[in-house]
Amino acid sequence: MKRRNADCSKLRRPLKRNRITEGIYGSTFLYLKFLVVWALVLLADFVLEFRFEYLWPFWLFIRSVYDSFRYQGLAFSVFFVCVAFTSNIICLLFIPIQWLFFAASTYVWVQYVWHTERGVCLPTVSLWILFVYIEAAIRFKDLKNFHVDLCRPFAAHCIGYPVVTLGFGFKSYVSYKMRLRKQKEVQKENEFYMQLLQQALPPEQQMLQKQEKEAEEAAKGLPDMDSSILIHHNGGIPANKKLSTTLPEIEYREKGKEKDKDAKKHNLGINNNNILQPVDSKIQEIEYMENHINSKRLNNDLVGSTENLLKEDSCTASSKNYKNASGVVNSSPRSHSATNGSIPSSSSKNEKKQKCTSKSPSAHKDLMENCIPNNQLSKPDALVRLEQDIKKLKADLQASRQVEQELRSQISSLSSTERGIRSEMGQLRQENELLQNKLHNAVQMKQKDKQNISQLEKKLKAEQEARSFVEKQLMEEKKRKKLEEATAARAVAFAAASRGECTETLRNRIRELEAEGKKLTMDMKVKEDQIRELELKVQELRKYKENEKDTEVLMSALSAMQDKTQHLENSLSAETRIKLDLFSALGDAKRQLEIAQGQILQKDQEIKDLKQKIAEVMAVMPSITYSAATSPLSPVSPHYSSKFVETSPSGLDPNASVYQPLKK
C-alpha cells in the first residue's frame, strides 16, 4: 500500500467577510436590543438609585478567576485576585468621583457593544457616540441621586480590572514576540549547520544536487504557482534548501505544533470556523514525522552506499563510478519525494535496502542495469519525472480532500450529537430543578404541618388550663351558693314567723336562681362531655401525627379542630357572659335580702321595745284604758292581752290590782 500525505493548507475554509460592510448591511434587531437593554438599565439605575451596569465587569472578574483556578492553578488565581484588588484600590483612591463614574459607565457600555459579532461598523460607532454623549451631558453632573459610597468600589473595579487584563495581554504579546525571535535565531543556526553539512558532502553528491537545480530551473516552464504551492504545502523544503531539516529543528517544530494543538483543543468550542484546526495540526505533525523518517532513511542509504563502495576494492573505477551513480540516481528520487513530503512504498524500500547491503552478482547486475551516468541525465527526463510527481500529488490531493470530507461529515455528526446531548442535559436539568422545587415545597408543607400541630397543642393546653380554672371557679361558686343558701334558709326560718308575704318574692327569686344554677350545671356537664370528645379527637390526631401517612387528612382534621375550637371559644364566651349576668342577679338578690332582713330586724327591735314599754305602763296603770282612736295596734280589745305575756320578758304581774314590787 502506498501512503499518502494530505494537503492541509489547501483545505477549503469559508472566506472571512469584511466586518465593516457586514455591520453596515446587518440587521437592526441586534442594535434595537442593545438600545432596549441600555434604556432598561438606565431606568433601573434611576428607580433603584444604583448603577447596575457596574455588576457586569464584576461578573467577568469572577469568571476569569474561576477559569484561572481551573486551568492555571490556585497560585496564579490568588496572584490575579491580589493584582486586581490593588488596581481597584489605586483607582478608588486616586481618581476623582465624577471622572471615576464617567469612565466606568462609558467603558462598560463601549465594551458591551464591542463584544458583539459585528465589530467596528457604523451602528456600533453611533451607539458609542450616543452612550458617551448621555454619560457626559446628563449623568456626569447628576450624582446626587445615587448611593455614591456603594457604587464607588464597583466603579473602581470597572476601571481597575480592564487595566489588569490589558497588562496581562501586553505581557503575553511581549512573550510571543520573544518566542518568535528565539525561533528565528534557532532557524538561522540550523541553516548555518545545514550549510556546513552540505559542504561536508562528497563532490559527486554536490554535482547531483547541481543537476537537480538545473532540472528544477528547466521545469520552470510549467506553471510556477502550482509547483511552488504543491512543494510548499506538502511539507517539503524550497529549492535553495538542498536537503531536509535536521532533527533538532524538526523536534522543536513538533513541540510547537503540539502546543498549538493543545491550545486549539482548548478553544475548540468557541467558533465553528475553527473546528478543523486540530485536524490540520495532526496532519502537519504526520508530515513532519514523515519528513524526518525520509531524511533518516536517505542519510542511512547514502552512508550504506559509501561503505559498500569502500569495501569493494576488486571492482574497476568504471564499476565504482556506476555504483556511485546508481546510488545517487536511486537516492535522488527518494530525496525528491522527501522534499515533496511523500513516503515511498514498502517494496521500494526493501529493494533499495537489498541493493545497498547485498554483494551478490545478481544484485550487482541489477544495479549496473538501473544506473545511469551523470552526463546522460537530460532535461526532458526531469520534466517527465516532475509531471509524474505532479500527477501523484494531484492524486494525493484528491485523497486528502476525500479524507477532509469524511472528517467534516464526522465533525458535523459529532456536533449534531453534541447538540442533542446538550438539549437532553438541559431537559434533565429542568426536570431536576422541578423535582427539587417539589421536594422543597413538600418539606415546607411538612414544616407548616408541624408548626400547626404544635400551635394546636398549645391551644389545647391553654383550653385545658382555662377549663381547670373555670372548674375551680364553679366549685367556689357552688360553695358560695351553698353558704348563701344556708344563710338564706336561716334568715327565712328566722323571719318566717314575723314576715309573711314580703319574703315570698325573694323565695321565688331564689327558686329561679336555683333552677338557673341547675341548668348551668347541666350545661357544664354537656360541655365536659364535649371536651372529652375533643380530647379523644386530639388523641386521634396525635396518632395521625405519629403515622404521617396523609397530610390532607391532617389538614382537614386540623381545620375541623380549628372550627370546633372556635365554636367552643364562642360558647365559652357566651357562658361566661351568662355567668356574669347570673352573678349580678345573685348580687342584687343578696342586697335585697340583706335590706329586707335589716328592715325585719329593725321592726322586731321596735316591737320588742314597744312590748316592754306597754308592759311597764300596764303594770303601773292597769285601770287606764284607751279608746279605739288612740290604739294603733288593737282598736277593739284593750291594751292588756295574753299575747304579751307569752312574749314579754318583763317579770311584773299584770293581773295584780295594786303594784307590788318583786320579793327577792
From Swiss-Prot:
Gene giving rise to this polypeptide: MACO1
Topology in membrane: Multi-pass membrane protein
InterPro entries: Macoilin
Protein name: Macoilin
Pfam family, one: Macoilin
Annotated TM spans: 28-48, 75-95, 120-140, 154-174
Source organism per UniProt: Sus scrofa
Top-level taxon of origin: Eukaryota
Main localization (coarse): endoplasmic reticulum
GO cellular component labels: axon; neuron projection terminus; nuclear membrane; rough endoplasmic reticulum membrane; synapse
